[in-house]
Amino acid sequence: MSVYENAQNFWEHFSSRQPEIEQALTSRDYPGLVRALEPVQESAMNLTGCGFFVEDAADQFEMTFDPGPNKTSQYLARYFTDLCPAEILKKWIVNPVLMPLSQKAVEAQVQIRDHVYTLMDFHVFYTVDQKAQTFQTRVYCPGYSLIDNKEKKKEMSMYLLELAIGQTLYEAYIGSVDFVNEPPKEAVDFCGLVDFYEAIMTVVERDH
């Protein structure tokens, strides 16, 4: 089948499950939501190489593909989004990539030992490479000192940073991501992770 036919088939599959998905979201029936989404998620993975997540936004339902760094999946997710039927778009917002501070980000929690942290507990220290137009970042969480595995802390920092600012800005402006167990002593710019999107946009708009 062509990519166009695959996209049509996917949205037909989604439409067949749409009432069940919407009911589960509205009633916050998460086990029911998982059951309703499972075959559609499998279809998305087979056809685009990525999954998606759904949310009950303020006045509309929202669906977001999560293609990660894979360029083919990014292309297919955007193509599928562009072909979403108008009937679905009457009730749904459909995003081809992870958006800044989505509901998923707002609700994200990280458990470290006996402590639970949200994005509000994370800070990012950063410098701007003016020549490359990128940000060199270090993410701090009070619980990082309790984790011995450096790779795990770096992966967590990368994931949460992308969750906070969205995939588009992450790929366009983040030059490096690292972690710190304690706030750095040298003078660098910093902000809460939930405020980093605005900080990036302020710098980008100022320099353009």
Regions found by a protein language model. Give the residues of each.
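Glycine-rich, aromatic-bearing surface loops/beta-hairpins
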Residues: 141-208
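Aromatic- and glycine-enriched beta-alpha-beta binding-site module
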Residues: 52-102
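Surface-exposed, low-hydrophobicity interaction/linker segments
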Residues: 11-51
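Short linear interaction motifs
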Residues: 44-48, 59, 115-120
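Aromatic/basic-lined ligand-recognition segments
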Residues: 89-147, 201
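Long, low-complexity, Ser/Thr/Gly/Pro-rich intrinsically disordered segments that act as flexible linkers
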Residues: 1-25, 53-54, 94, 98-101, ...
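Well-ordered, non-membrane alpha-helical segments in soluble/globular domains
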Residues: 30-40, 74-77, 153-162
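Short glycine-rich, basic-tinged beta-strand/loop micro-motifs
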Residues: 12-23, 58-67, 133-146
